[in-house]
């Protein structure tokens, strides 16, 4: 199988934010205790004209801009999300049409809770590495929902990132050294058809779910590559909240210098399928040639995908071709709880 790498990437975030204090105030909760417990200060809120498709399209267009390739050369488009706008009508087709990819390509919408985006990256790696196509695109994006008053309401956010995978070494922004996955049947978080909001197992979502899969996924990747945390310059993990992320990073031996760029949850919330892709995009925005990145996603149900990535010198040529994730984070406008309820369609008659 041929070596494959990232040849283009892009991200997108809504500009609206709501502070933890506004949510807590509406429910008579202690905002400071919640912020300390979750390590989340505020989260993104999609506007009334934003959904997973619009976020995916904008991310994909930015990825194409950085890649500098003809969109017609892309042979596959995958969009991973648990908040696709339609139950029956592919988001991937919308993205491809908006980006000028169609009609000569294959597409699919993916679901695996919060790791659907990284599952798409693995599929693209296989298709390009086997020489079935020249390029493939994977997007991870979500506009997540939490029931009013539930703990998820402080974290369920919106955002996404796209990655174009290719096999021409001279086009690599970053090279994949390897990937590894760890998957079980663990019912920590779920939502049935026709239900508006997901249910979760509370504390059960920690040790037997998130930590078991992220830590085993990470250890499996390191064993496969013969590495330790000291061999990497940066890392990013799935981040349902800041506390879980920091705990996982420290258990694996990573330092603040290694994990700081991947950690976006305190300022953004949990963007679900977009969480690890956004963290990786922010790392790439700050990385330099030969930096090595360790990536582990997590999707409830449950599974983790891990990646070992090395950045190339081409990164310096493409970063400034599009807006960075950090700049998107800085472009924000706060809304109160009433506007948040309106924008998220939570006021039901």
From Swiss-Prot:
* Keyword vocabulary terms for this entry: Acyltransferase, Isoprene biosynthesis, Transferase
Pathway(s) annotated for this protein in UniProt:
Metabolic intermediate biosynthesis; (R)-mevalonate biosynthesis; (R)-mevalonate from acetyl-CoA: step 2/3
Question: Quick check: keyword NADP in the entry?
Answer: no
**Swiss-Prot/TrEMBL catalytic activity:** acetoacetyl-CoA + acetyl-CoA + H2O = (3S)-3-hydroxy-3-methylglutaryl-CoA + CoA + H(+)
Q: Which GO terms describe its biological process?
A: farnesyl diphosphate biosynthetic process, mevalonate pathway; isopentenyl diphosphate biosynthetic process, mevalonate pathway
Query: Which positions does UniProt annotate for (3S)-3-hydroxy-3-methylglutaryl-CoA binding?
Result: 30-31, 114, 155, 205, 238, 270, 300
Q: Name one GO molecular function term.
A: acetyl-CoA C-acetyltransferase activity
Catalytic site residues? 82 (proton donor/acceptor), 114 (acyl-thioester intermediate), 238 (proton donor/acceptor)
User: Where on this chain does CoA bind?
Assistant: 203, 243
Q: Which domain of life is it from?
A: Archaea
Question: What Pfam family is a match for this entry?
Answer: ACP_syn_III_C
Query: Which EC class heads this enzyme's classification?
Result: transferase
EC number(s) for this protein? 2.3.3.10
Q: Which family does it belong to?
A: Belongs to the thiolase-like superfamily. Archaeal HMG-CoA synthase family.
Query: What job does the chain carry out?
Result: Catalyzes the condensation of acetyl-CoA with acetoacetyl-CoA to form 3-hydroxy-3-methylglutaryl-CoA (HMG-CoA). Functions in the mevalonate (MVA) pathway leading to isopentenyl diphosphate (IPP), a key precursor for the biosynthesis of isoprenoid compounds that are building blocks of archaeal membrane lipids.
Under the subunit heading, UniProt states: Interacts with acetoacetyl-CoA thiolase that catalyzes the precedent step in the pathway and with a DUF35 protein. The acetoacetyl-CoA thiolase/HMG-CoA synthase complex channels the intermediate via a fused CoA-binding site, which allows for efficient coupling of the endergonic thiolase reaction with the exergonic HMGCS reaction.
Protein name (Swiss-Prot/TrEMBL): Hydroxymethylglutaryl-CoA synthase
């Amino acid at each position: 199988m041929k070596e494959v790498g990232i040849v283009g990437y892009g991200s997108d975030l809504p500009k609206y934010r709501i502070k933890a204090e506004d949510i807590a105030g509406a429910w008579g909760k202690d905002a400071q205790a919640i912020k300390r417990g979750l390590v989340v200060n505020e989260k993104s809120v999609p506007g009334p004209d934003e959904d997973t498709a619009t976020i995916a399209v904008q991310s994909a267009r930015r990825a194409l801009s950085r890649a500098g390739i003809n969109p017609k050369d892309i042979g596959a488009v995958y969009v991973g999300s648990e908040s696709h706008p339609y139950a029956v009508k592919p988001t991937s087709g919308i993205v491809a049409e908006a980006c000028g990819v169609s009609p000569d390509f294959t597409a699919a919408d993916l679901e695996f809770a919060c790791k659907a985006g990284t599952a798409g990256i693995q599929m693209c790696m296989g298709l390009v590495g086997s020489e079935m196509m020249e390029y493939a695109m994977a997007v991870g994006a979500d506009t997540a929902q939490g029931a009013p008053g539930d703990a998820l309401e402080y974290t369920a956010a919106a955002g996404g990132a796209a990655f174009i995978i290719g096999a021409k070494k001279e086009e690599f922004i970053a090279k994949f050294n390897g990937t590894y996955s760890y998957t079980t049947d663990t019912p920590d978080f779920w939502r049935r058809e026709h239900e508006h909001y997901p249910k979760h197992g509370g504390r059960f979502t920690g040790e037997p779910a998130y930590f078991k899969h992220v830590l085993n996924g990470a250890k499996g990747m390191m064993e496969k590559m013969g590495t330790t945390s000291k061999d990497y310059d940066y890392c990013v993990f799935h981040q349902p909240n800041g506390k879980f992320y920091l705990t996982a990073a420290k258990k694996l031996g990573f330092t603040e210098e290694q994990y700081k760029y991947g950690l976006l949850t305190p300022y953004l919330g949990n963007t679900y399928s977009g969480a690890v892709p956004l963290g990786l995009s922010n790392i790439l925005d700050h990385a330099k040639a030969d930096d090595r990145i360790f990536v582990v996603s997590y999707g409830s149900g449950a599974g983790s995908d891990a990646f070992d990535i090395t950045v190339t010198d081409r990164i310096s040529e493409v970063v400034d071709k599009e807006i960075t994730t950090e700049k998107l984070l800085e472009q924000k406008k706060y809304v109160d709880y009433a506007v948040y309820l309106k924008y998220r369609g939570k006021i039901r008659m």
